[in-house]
Every structure is written in C-alpha cells, then in structure tokens.
Amino acid sequence: MRHYYSVAAIRDAEASLLASLPDGVLMKRAAYGLASVIIRELAVRTGGVTGRRVCAVVGSGDNGGDALWAATFLRRRGAAADAVLLNPDRVHRKALVAFRKAGGRIVENVSAATDLVIDGVVGISGSGPLRPAAAAVFATVSASGVPVVAVDLPSGIDVVTGVINGPAVHAALTVTFGGLKPVHALADCGDVTLVDIGLDLPDSDILGLQAADVAAYWPVPGVHDDKYTQGVTGVLAGSSTYPGAAVLCTGAAVAATSGMVRYAGSAYTQVLAHWPEVIASATPTAAGRVQSWVVGPGLGIDATATAALWFALETDLPVLVDADGLTMLAAHPDLVINRNAPTVLTPHASEFARLAGTPPGDDRVGACRKLADSFGATVLLKGNVTVIADPGGPVYLNPAGQSWAATAGSGDVLSGMIGALLAAGLPAAEAAAAAAFVHARAAALSAADPGPGDVPTSASRMVSHIRTALAAL
C-alpha cells in the first residue's frame, strides 16, 4: 500500500528529526540518497558515472541545497559537475562551498555536453509555474532531450493538486524523501523513487493500491463456495438506444469474479447472445436474488429507467450508480443521502458537476471528498488519475500511467467490475479502488495485444483482458 502525505505532515516529521540531529546531517542524508539514485540512472543511460557530466539547476532554499550536495557527491565519484544558480544571493552557502571545493563549476547555462540535469529549483514548499529565468533554462534542456531528475517534485507543478498552470519541468525521474506526496500520483513526475531519510510518519488517509494489495482484496473461490456464495451481481443497464452498455457491463461482471450475473432490462436478447452464462430477464422484479446492483450505464432517463433506479436504491443492497443513473440522481439526491447500504457513484467530470453543482476544479481530491461526505456515498471520480473517496474515510489514488481506457464504453466495463466486487462482499471504497487498478491494467494489456507496440483499443477488448490483468497481479 502506498501512503501519500501532506506537506504539513512531512514538515512536522522533519522538524522532529532535525531537532535530534546535528546541523546539516538531514540534508546530506537526503542528498546522498539522491546522488545514489542518479548514479544508478547514469549507469543505465550512459554506462557509468566517471567522465559523465551533470548539471544542477539550483534555486534558493533547501531544495537547491539538496541538488548542490548531490552534485558534490557525484563530482567526488568522478563526474563533471556544473551548477546554474538562479538566485546566487540566496543559494545554500554550505552546499555551495562544498560543491566548489569538490571541483564543481558555476555556469550560466546547461552545457550541450550534459548527460543529466538535476532540478533543484523549488521543493514541496514552492507553488506556481517556473519563473522566467528557470523557464528559459528548462526550455533549452527540454529541446536538447537531456533527461531531468527532479528533487522532490518537478518544479512548476502544484504540490497539492498536481496542476500545471504555466512553464514546468518535465522530469524523467523524481526523487522524493521520507514519504510520497499526492502530487506524485496526481501529476506526471516520471518514475518516482522514494528515499528513506528516517522520518517517523503515521499511516495517512490518502492511499494507493499496489498489485499485491489488489491480489489480496480480489475474491478467490473457497473450497466450499458455490455460484451463490461468491456473490450474485445484478445489472440494470442498456436500452434500445444503447444495448451495448448492457453487454459491456455484464461482460465485465462475468469476467471479474466467478459467481453469477443477473441482468434485467430491454437489452436481454443482446446480453444473452454475448454472454450465455448471464441469467437475463426483462424487468428488475423478475431478476431474482442478487447481492449488489449496478444501475445506469446506457439506461436512458425515461420512466422505465427512473423506475429501475428507484428499485435498486430502495433495496438494502450495495448499489453502484453510473452514467444515466447519475443524471437522474442529480435531480433526486435524497435517494442516496438517506441510504444505509453502501452506495458507489462513478462520475466523470461533467457528471460530477451535475451532482455537486460545480466542476471538480483543480483540487480533485478535495472536491471528491466533499461530494462523498455530502452524499454519504463512495465517489469514484474518473480520469487518468482516478480518485476514490469514502465518506469520512480514506481517499485512494489510482494513476493509470496511460490513457488507453479513454474510450467509449470503458466506464460501463468499470461499473460491472465494481458491481461484481460489491456482490462478493468487498467494502465500497476497496471495491472501487481495486477495480480501477485492474481496469487500467486491462486497458493497457488490450492496447499491447498482440504487440509488438501499443495500438488503439476498445471497451470490448478491455473486457477480454480483465482475466489477463488479474493473472498478472
């Protein structure tokens, strides 16, 4: 499990540790870790360290000090080391003295012969885009294709929201210290490496599942399980206009777990043609017993659709509401607010705005938390980084790392997967987070099949790769 910490939590832990250490020890510890990561990166990219050239772009404060000390350690290992000082009057003095003593050079610009650039402009206390001088330096670096290693986070990216509102560093690798921050999931920070500097941090309430966590959560049939005890997923989706939504949603539920899927709606003929193992009927009341309901994908907003939404939400079962279900729910939020059973809402940005009255904005984590608390429901906000908020509980971040899931019908697939996990008994937030993780993996695998390169994919192909994604956990 990944834990993401606020800047305040990191600063509090640093203050406690700094009080117990001699002056400068913590900075050197961080810089040594940074230099060690850079040594490995240089070895991979260039075959070694000796004779290679690094350049630290140095801002004021401790972030610049980390970069200078790291460049000093690299110089001592045989690399040529340069430094561009963006604010010479406010540079970390002790680090600069050590850098010069080791033979480092102060330069005006990054040399064309540079093998790697260290971004030490601003750290986790900074905000806003790069200032003109730094922006000019990194524009040249970007044009030259020299890889950048960022210290703590790529400068110019908002540390809280991950939003970029102007010039920013594009890093191949980010090295951070003590604990991950939400920005490392919310923004493109390249590969992220965490260096342990001895901070004593509690568990956080912003989390990220890893493959081992998902494997532990995902239901596996026990020796004495049958199709009923594994969970029966009910699906209320599709219409004469969008029968494919029903096919995709039920297919994803079939692929996600080994229990049973029941479908109720007008697309039952198409569903059975694709998935003969599904038990299909024309109406919810005829569907039979289930352990969860998925309602909304392709359902429409007519009287029949409204009745289906009412039917599901008036049960005492876990319910996932998506797509057209969210549109109807926006007009009748009391249907969810008064529920005692688990409810999962899975909006994209426009659907979120209808539910909340305003778009999620830059602070997607804060907005998702607020909506979850106001509705008393687990909210999954779709995007390249999926945000899942539990009312009064943790937030899960799932960075996809690619956008292959951004295709028509992809949300229908995700809904079916979450519904299957709810039927199997997983808590709502864990079901949503685990399904989002596997959903992103299935999208990537479907784009890579048959190879050798990635190609456009589709929601139908994603369904067929759910099991492959699960097997790879």
Swiss-Prot record:
Family matches, as CDD domains:
YXKO-related (cd01171)
| Chain positions recorded as (6S)-NADPHX 2 binding sites | 298, 412
Task: Look up the signal peptide feature and give its range.
Answer: none
| Catalyzed reactions per annotation | (6S)-NADHX + ADP = AMP + phosphate + NADH + H(+); (6S)-NADPHX + ADP = AMP + phosphate + NADPH + H(+); (6R)-NADHX = (6S)-NADHX; (6R)-NADPHX = (6S)-NADPHX
- Where is the segment annotated ADP-dependent (S)-NAD(P)H-hydrate dehydratase? 210-473
NCBIfam families, from UniProt?
A: yjeF_cterm (TIGR00196), yjeF_nterm (TIGR00197)
Q: Any idea what this protein is called?
A: Bifunctional NAD(P)H-hydrate repair enzyme Nnr
State the organism named in the record: Mycobacterium leprae (strain TN)
Its gene is nnr
